[in-house]
């Protein structure tokens, strides 16, 4: 598959404005350094993300998933393959009951902390100063001040490499 064909396929999945080539990664990381991604996409729904993952794996195309780009070092040589960024459109919170929330991976920890505090929910204070998103925090078990994500997470919904949602 040539470069134009790949870009066309990515645009079919996520829309014309959400797929780009040669995207400077320094504008997507907190360190503000790094070269360009060969391809950069921002899916706007779980369904788009699933289609994207299926397509990339079926086509044997390298990809990486990022959130807010917090503490992410990108080489000046850039990133080969496709960068999938989950941030702005994956930042919803759903209040399940008095002590349980369901949060999408792109929500910033500081924003979640504020939302939980506004509802009078405690236990997340340790994470509000961590510069990152929920997805990254879960992936690396972020922690501070004696608290860790593993101490407060009940479950996670994830996509496998075939794009299947697993709870």
Regions found by a protein language model. Give the residues of each.
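Anion-binding (especially nucleotide phosphate/pyrophosphate-binding) glycine-rich loop
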Residues: 3-134
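FAD-binding subdomain of flavoenzyme oxidoreductases
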Residues: 125-127, 134-167
């Amino acid at each position: 598959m040539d470069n134009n064909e790949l870009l066309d396929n990515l645009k079919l999945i996520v829309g014309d404005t959400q797929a780009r080539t040669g995207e400077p990664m320094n504008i997507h990381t907190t360190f503000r350094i790094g070269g360009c991604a060969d391809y950069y996409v921002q899916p706007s729904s779980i369904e788009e993300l699933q289609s994207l993952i299926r397509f990339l794996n079926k086509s044997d195309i390298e990809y990486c998933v990022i959130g807010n780009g917090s503490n992410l070092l990108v080489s000046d040589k850039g990133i080969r393959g496709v960068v999938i960024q989950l941030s702005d459109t994956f930042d919803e919170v759903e209040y399940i009951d008095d002590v349980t929330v369901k949060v999408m991976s792109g929500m910033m920890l500081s924003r979640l902390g504020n939302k939980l505090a506004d509802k009078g929910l405690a236990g997340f204070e340790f994470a509000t100063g961590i510069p990152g998103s929920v997805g990254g925090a879960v992936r690396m078990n972020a922690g501070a001040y004696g608290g860790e994500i593993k101490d407060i997470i009940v479950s996670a919904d994830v996509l496998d490499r075939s794009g299947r949602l697993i709870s």
